[in-house]
Amino acid sequence: MTVGKSSKMLQHIDYRMRCILQDGRIFIGTFKAFDKHMNLILCDCDEFRKIKPKNSKQAEREEKRVLGLVLLRGENLVSMTVEGPPPKDTGIARVPLAGAAGGPGIGRAAGRGIPAGVPMPQAPAGLAGPVRGVGGPSQQVMTPQGRGTVAAAAAAATASIAGAPTQYPPGRGGPPPPMGRGAPPPGMMGPPPGMRPPMGPPMGLPPGRGTPMGMPPPGMRPPPPGMRGLL
């Protein structure tokens, strides 16, 4: 059902209405809505009914019941009358105007996470990101803690491989002396002064066949002439 703006029912919305039903009960409440079947919705509704006494000497008494929100069927409705004007909206909080005087409180946005006064935690040295611009910390400060010994050992190993002089621990003697080309091994006598050391194959390689051997060491007789080719 289409209801026009000039309908009398719309003019009584939010009014306190008295509704009388067929069984004699009276409902007084705030009129909120209706439909084409005259079904009504009342809020803050009170029910009033008259109770007949058992004896004729006693008068009728009226009983009141607080119901709240009520839906009334239109088929039971007999009449509707205005009980009072719309109630004032005292319980609804309204937004204050910009020019209105403020109270003692201060309006602030609700904070999320860490409060504003608490300082932010910073990452330890060496674990933070790169510093932009000039004036950042030195490389020693940026080196992660706990890894200095590993880096020093790696640097020492690289230096020894590259040819740096190796330091030997004390108490175990120095490095073995270098051996020259003509120097005899330890425990053997060298050639007398003025004599040339024998020319032989490099150390560690046996003399090949047909290769003339060098001069024998002093004190040893050379092999016979016929035996030289067999060696």
UniProtKB/Swiss-Prot annotation:
Subcellular location: Cytoplasm, Cytosol; Nucleus
Keywords carried by this UniProt record: Cytoplasm, Methylation, mRNA processing, mRNA splicing, Nucleus, Repeat, Ribonucleoprotein, RNA-binding, Spliceosome
Matches recorded under SMART domains: Sm
Matches recorded under Gene3D superfamilies: 2.30.30.100
Gene Ontology terms, MF aspect: histone pre-mRNA DCP binding; telomerase RNA binding; U1 snRNP binding; U2 snRNP binding
Alphabetical list of InterPro entries matching this protein: LSM_dom_sf, Sm, Sm_dom_euk/arc, snRNP-assoc_SmB/SmN
Pro residues composition bias: residue spans: 172-205, 214-231
Positions carrying Omega-N-methylarginine: R108, R112, R147, R172
Residue span of region Disordered: 163-231
Sequence repeat ranges per the UniProt record: 175-181, 191-196, 216-221, 222-228
Function field: Plays a role in pre-mRNA splicing as a core component of the spliceosomal U1, U2, U4 and U5 small nuclear ribonucleoproteins (snRNPs), the building blocks of the spliceosome. Component of both the pre-catalytic spliceosome B complex and activated spliceosome C complexes. As a component of the minor spliceosome, involved in the splicing of U12-type introns in pre-mRNAs. As part of the U7 snRNP it is involved in histone pre-mRNA 3'-end processing.
Subunit structure: Core component of the spliceosomal U1, U2, U4 and U5 small nuclear ribonucleoproteins (snRNPs), the building blocks of the spliceosome. Most spliceosomal snRNPs contain a common set of Sm proteins, SNRPB, SNRPD1, SNRPD2, SNRPD3, SNRPE, SNRPF and SNRPG that assemble in a heptameric protein ring on the Sm site of the small nuclear RNA to form the core snRNP. Component of the U1 snRNP. The U1 snRNP is composed of the U1 snRNA and the 7 core Sm proteins SNRPB, SNRPD1, SNRPD2, SNRPD3, SNRPE, SNRPF and SNRPG, and at least three U1 snRNP-specific proteins SNRNP70/U1-70K, SNRPA/U1-A and SNRPC/U1-C.
Name under which the protein is recorded: Small nuclear ribonucleoprotein-associated protein B
Originating species: Mus musculus
Gene name of the record: Snrpb
